[in-house]
UniProtKB/Swiss-Prot annotation:
This is Putative O-phosphotransferase Mb2669. SUPFAM superfamilies: P-loop containing nucleoside triphosphate hydrolases. ATP binds at G30, G31, S32, S33, A34, G35, K36, T37. The keyword Nucleotide-binding applies. Its EC number is 2.7.1.-. Keywords: ATP-binding, Nucleotide-binding, Transferase.
Length: 225
């Protein structure tokens, strides 16, 4: 039986020998206000290679403005609910509708276009559903993807949400639970108290020390086998 890691390395080498461009993807997955965007921007400035930042917000804010208003959004975009659970904390949850699902699928296809043209991408994400995760696994088949978990403490996440002023209470809490529910990571970072430039350096060092990421392979075995 062929070792999947060796087979994957061979594909990368054959692509390089053929002169084919090979874009790489770093996927930062975590809840709202976990610090993913700040981390991505700091990483861009630190890295010697060019990394394009294509975050989820770029596509989220491309939706019609009315559909970003929780009081007016139509169910074909998404529905949402908020509840105080047994822990006494408020949890906010988004349930994507078909239009939001299609927008996120299109986002993954757009990122894939960059990779296929030899451009590296760092993308911050909130993987709200298992379906989004499975879609990413399919779209990025054959690509080198570093899956990075980005975490923040509940207290600090709530403080950041309040400071932003445009988030429903419990948004960070609920989105973090959804994002990490099915995920596996090549490495993880906690943004609670560490300065972003230090986290960017840690991310860059971890990326360099891990030339053949395996988290996506493990996830494919779980969900696509």
């Amino acid at each position: 039986m062929i070792n999947p890691t060796r087979a994957r390395r061979m594909r990368y080498r054959l692509a390089a020998m053929a002169g084919m461009p090979e874009g790489k993807l770093i996927l930062l997955n975590g809840g709202s206000s976990a610090g993913k965007t700040s981390l991505a921007l700091a990483f861009q400035d630190l890295a010697a290679e060019c990394w394009m930042h294509i975050g989820i917000d770029l596509f989220w804010f491309a939706l019609p403005p009315e559909q970003l208003d929780l009081a007016r959004v139509r169910p074909e975009y998404y529905t949402w609910d908020s509840a105080v659970e047994a822990d006494g904390l408020e949890w906010f949850t988004v349930h994507p509708g078909p239009i939001l699902d299609l927008a996120m699928h299109s986002r993954y296809r757009a990122i894939r276009a960059y990779l296929d043209n030899g451009m590296n991408v760092i993308a911050d994400d909130v993987i709200w559903t298992r379906e989004w995760l499975v879609d990413a696994l399919r779209v990025f088949e054959g690509c080198r993807v570093w899956m990075v978990g980005v975490h923040v403490s509940d207290e600090e996440g709530a403080r950041r949400e309040l400071e932003r002023g445009d988030r429903h209470p419990g948004w960070n809490r609920g989105s973090a639970r959804a994002a990490h529910a099915d995920a596996e990571y090549d490495f993880e970072l906690d943004t609670t108290a560490t300065p972003v430039h230090e986290l960017a350096r840690e991310l860059h060092e971890s990326y360099q020390a891990c030339p053949y990421p395996m988290a996506f392979n493990r996830l494919r075995k779980r969900f696509l086998s």
